Structures are given as structure tokens and as C-alpha cells.
Amino acid sequence: MNLTEKWKDLLEAEGADMPEIATATKQKIMSKIFENQDRDINNDPMYRDPQLVEAFNAGLNEAVVNGDHGYDPANIAQGVTTGAVTNIGPTVMGMVRRAIPQLIAFDIAGVQPMTGPTSQVFTLRSVYGKDPLTGAEAFHPTRQADASFSGQAAASTIADFPTTGAATDGTPYKAEVTTSGGDVSMRYFLALGAVTLAVAGQMTATEYTDGVAGGLLVEIDAGMATSQAELQENFNGSSNNEWNEMSFRIDKQVVEAKSRQLKAQYSIELAQDLRAVHGLDADAELSGILANEVMVELNREIVNLVNSQAQIGKSGWTQGAGAAGVFDFSDAVDVKGARWAGEAYKALLIQIEKEANEIGRQTGRGNGNFIIASRNVVSALSMTDTLVGPAAQGMQDGSMNTDTNQTVFAGVLGGRFKVYIDQYAVNDYFTVGFKGSTEMDAGVFYSPYVPLTPLRGSDSKNFQPVIGFKTRYGVQVNPFADPTASATKVGNGAPVAASMGKNAYFRRVFVKGL
């Protein structure tokens, strides 16, 4: 029996506060999370601690039928029990069932549960040449393929493009060209006129544009002559004409589980008075507070991780004019001389579209398909029409949700972008990101290990009760996220300072004057 079948009843359980687990992928992920939680329940005696059972039994008595002999999804959904509770595992499982599926990580990050305290990520990279550590990466989305690599011998006689005096007699030259977006690729040229480079063998975007647009350069690629191909690899007495080679390497990164934990201590007097006056159970109330706080903080960590990893938007290919990283409604350049608010809002949509396209160009996986934004930006998107007249507003007819007391999911923009509200944003901004159809196709990964572990004890000095909750999980950055690190060996996948602002799966733009 696979895990999805094993946990089918719990996955499909319905209740007032039970979020739907609709897709097969999400059900598969949640079944692994349930299995990790179940393993912890069975192995840790804490779940059968009499004091903890007593504390949970009063206010969180969902769980089991006839004691602790199995899970009843209907009871878990309704929060009831029909037998003596001797194991709080099902209670905790119910909390996991309600809380984990609502994490924003399922929408903006890849979710890959861990089966142990450490996991590994393996990355295969194809490279040019014999040395897999120093060779330039092949099949890179932002680097043009070396289109003459297979068309020449390893001991190539094509010279680097000189700084001045390039021959115009049909002699080919090669140079590494850096585009305006910062991409570097090897290209081959014929000089038709005088071309000057600042550095031999290296061509800037301006030098390339001036040369090609001015008719001084043409880009060429070709295979080798048959006579040359026949004499490769020392055939018929020839020498120094080996075949060009390609190789690959496999990079390994380690993901380690980290923890979040909170505790709460209260007096016996508080518990007694709370029960007598309000009919509330202190353990139940504090347990809910602690568990919810852990989940809220985890949600916030994922949003902050995405924003900190995001590249500066409105830069490179997406800048055009105006200040980098900022879309200013009061700047006529940014809004393209808009006359009315509707036209200005459309300019914002165009900028979002450009950022989404840039994500697709750099990742080679797909254009951006979700947006995280402040409330004001979401409101602006809600009042913008991309299809009707130039000044029309109301593409969504105001139907986008901007009330985070309901949900942080605002709606779908133009049938393409899922929009989420950052309810804690301190300034207006939007982040465009991409998540593919699989959990491996994302810029960052959330890897839950043990979702929730309850703890209870008494202070050894004052004998007052103490309760706590712990969660364990890992966070990982996609090893292909930095498009500039294609040739270097990636050894650390943790979200360290060196990786901030370089993740091609996300692009962030601040919004002014809204």
C-alpha cells in the first residue's frame, strides 16, 4: 500500500476548518508529512505522557475511537472522541492536517518532505571540455550554445578577436560576448571593417551592438571540412587534432533540518480561575496560540526568503528607462506618459509582464506565474483593465480580495498570475516568481521533517505547568537559481548571504507614488 492510499481517509476528511487537499501532488506530499508525524508519534513516549494526555483531553479531545487504536478522520475533522484518550498523537495529527496544507510554501516554493534529519540534493551539469570543474556549462538558458564547438578540433586555430586592426580578409575570430543582461557566451565573427575592442577576446554589449548594427561584424558558425574531419585523432599520421569533448559533473548539497520551538508557562491559579470564570482550558488555549504562532512565523520565513532571494527587478533587460528596481507612478518615463490612472496602471502590468518574461529567459523553465505584493499594489492590479479602452479600469472588476483577514490569496490576474498579499509589507512592492508543475521546479524548497511535536512539563522550582511546541524542517535554494554561477561548483545550498538577490526564479520591484 502506498502512502497516499494509507492516509486516504485523512487526506479526504472534511470539516469546517479542514482545508481541501485537492491535487494528487499535494496529497502525495501531505501523505509523506503524515507518515513522518506518525513515526514520531509511535517512537516518542511524550505523546503518551499522562500529564500531556490530560492537558489535551479537555480542550482538544479529537482523535480516536476506543482509546488510541487508530485514526478516525471524521472525528479528527469534528474534534470529538468516542473513547478514553491515552495517546494525543491523533490530536496532533489533526492540528497538522489543518495547518500544514494552508502554508504559502505550497504555492510559491517546492515542498519536498525529508525522511531524516539530513537530506541531499544532486545536480547534474553538462560542461564543455575535459575538466568538469572548470569547463563552461552547456545548455545554459542565458548562454548561447558554442555553435562552432563540434565544428572544430580541440586544438582550435581560431584566434581571439584583437583590440585593433582586425583582418577583413575573411579570417574568423572568437570573443566572449557580454550582453546588456550580463550573460556571457562564446561567439565567432568575421570582421568587415575596423573594429576596436577594449580587451582582446572580450566584447561588451555596446561593442557588439556598434559592430553588428554598423555592418562591421557578422556572426558566423560552421562545421569543419571533410578533409579536416578525416584527419582527426592522429589518423594517417596527423597530430594535435583531437576531437572536442564534453563531460558532466554531479554536484551534491546537504539539507539539514532546523527547528522552531516555543513554550508557555502559566500559574495553577490562572488555570483554575480561567476555567471557573470563562469555562476555558489554559492548556488548550495556549496550545493553540503556540502552534499557530509557529505556523505564522514559518509562513513569514518563506515569504521573506523569496523576497531576499529575488533579483532586483526593473534592471538589465527589463529596465528600459528610469531608476533600477523602482517603478515610480510619478515618473512620466515609467508610466510612458500616461494621461489617466488606468493608463498608468497598465504600465505597471507591462512591467510585471517584462519581469515574468525575464524569469523565463534566465531559468529556461517558464515565465513567472505568481505575484507577491503589498495591499496597495494588489488593489491597483484589481482595478486595471488590460483588454478594454486605454483609460478603462477594472480588469478584475474589483473582485480581487484585499482583505487578509479572509485569506492572503487575492485571486488570479489576467488568467495567468496567482496573486498573494504580503499583509506585513512596510512599503509598496511586487515580486514576480515562478513555480512549475512539479515540486522540483521552484526557486526555493521547503522540506518539512516532523511538523509538530507537543511538550509538557512542570517547573522544578515553582511547580507551575509549562507547555511547548516544536517543528523541524529544512530550507534549500535551487542549485540552478543563480544564472551567473554556471561554471562554479555549488557546495552550499543554504540561503546564505552570498545567494541573496541572485535567484533567477524571483524578481522584485518597489512601487512609488501609488
From Swiss-Prot:
<comment type="subunit">
    <text>Homohexamer. Interacts with the portal protein. Interacts with the capsid vertex protein that forms pentamers.</text>
</comment>
<keyword id="KW-0946">Virion</keyword>
<dbReference type="InterPro" id="IPR038997">
    <property type="entry name" value="CAPSID_Myoviridae"/>
</dbReference>
<dbReference type="GO" id="GO:0019028">
    <property type="term" value="C:viral capsid"/>
</dbReference>
<keyword id="KW-0167">Capsid protein</keyword>
<feature type="site" description="Cleavage">
    <location>
        <begin position="62"/>
        <end position="63"/>
    </location>
</feature>
<comment type="similarity">
    <text>Belongs to the T4 phage capsid protein family.</text>
</comment>
<protein>
    <recommendedName>
        <fullName>Major capsid protein</fullName>
    </recommendedName>
</protein>
<comment type="function">
    <text>Major capsid protein that self-associates to form hexamers, building most of the capsid in association with pentons made of the capsid vertex protein and one dodecamer of the portal protein.</text>
</comment>
<dbReference type="InterPro" id="IPR010762">
    <property type="entry name" value="Gp23/Gp24_T4-like"/>
</dbReference>
<dbReference type="Pfam" id="PF07068">
    <property type="entry name" value="Gp23"/>
</dbReference>
<keyword id="KW-0426">Late protein</keyword>
